[in-house]
Amino acid sequence: MDRTRIVRRWRRNMDVADDAEYVEMLATLSEGSVRRNFNPYTDIDWESPEFAVTDNDPRWILPATDPLGRHPWYQAQSRERQIEIGMWRQANVAKVGLHFESILIRGLMNYTFWMPNGSPEYRYCLHESVEECNHTMMFQEMVNRVGADVPGLPRRLRWVSPLVPLVAGPLPVAFFIGVLAGEEPIDHTQKNVLREGKSLHPIMERVMSIHVAEEARHISFAHEYLRKRLPRLTRMQRFWISLYFPLTMRSLCNAIVVPPKAFWEEFDIPREVKKELFFGSPESRKWLCDMFADARMLAHDTGLMNPIARLVWRLCKIDGKPSRYRSEPQRQHLAAAPAA
């Protein structure tokens, strides 16, 4: 009997037709995907001379918004070394994005498999999957052009990646929190780089611009999905989710933002530099906290910021003020970056 009740509740949560505002939001996102979408091989002229990847191109030097780019150790390296490190770093960020979005696509396919006929979520999830497939091709093409043999996600996460999408069917709330935990750090980092206005290599600038433009819809959907589903959970479920939320944010952030072991060995970067960068210095801790201002806003708005959850956010070192609105620029951080 209990199992039947759980299945009925699960199926009822899949039906969203009774929420006109939510359905309208899904229609808006779906129409946005139709009207404004990108193809990695028609919207990026990979063969253009200006897109050529050449040695000693200073546009690959890491910007000040990157924690390594503003560190004295990096700035003390020769220009050639800075370029080499920058190319490897940016290629690995693209590979990490590729790996994460591959997991996301598989999860969305598992989630939509169980959707009832007529669900407006089905259409939008498929639009998002198509866009993410294009992103993975775009990221891989960038890695190929740069020429660095980068690993992407840490090995342990690559090994468990086939299991993660299986969560999307029975535990979609947990899955979409994981989606945000992966999307928010990448989106935050890329927006800061574009806002800084530094001269970037055209490949990197175009790839980032396309990704940020389409990722805005994906993050909006994940936020609205959770705003709709979280109130339907039982009190005990919301409590456990409130603890899972910050733990997932921090653990996936580490996997996505911190370069893999191969990076530190390849360039013989001192251990104390790594410690300062991730996240031993006050500046790096602020950068970490800033990434999750939108996530904290969502936790506040959905009642997940209870006293114990606040403690977990603090222990994870990602506590702080929530955003006033989504994608609010962290102006103090941006202002300080060029001076670093």
Curated annotation (Swiss-Prot):
Metal-binding keyword on record: no
Record-linked InterPro entries: AurF/CmlI (IPR025859), Ferritin-like_SF (IPR009078), RNR-like (IPR012348)
Keywords recorded for this protein, A-Z: Cell membrane, Membrane, Transmembrane, Transmembrane helix
Residues passing through the membrane, by range: 162-182, 239-259
An example Gene Ontology CC term for this record: plasma membrane
GO molecular function: oxidoreductase activity
Subcellular location: Cell membrane
Membrane topology classification: Multi-pass membrane protein
Domain of life of the source: Bacteria
Main localization (coarse): membrane
Name of the protein described by the UniProt record: Uncharacterized protein Mb0909
Record organism: Mycobacterium bovis (strain ATCC BAA-935 / AF2122/97)
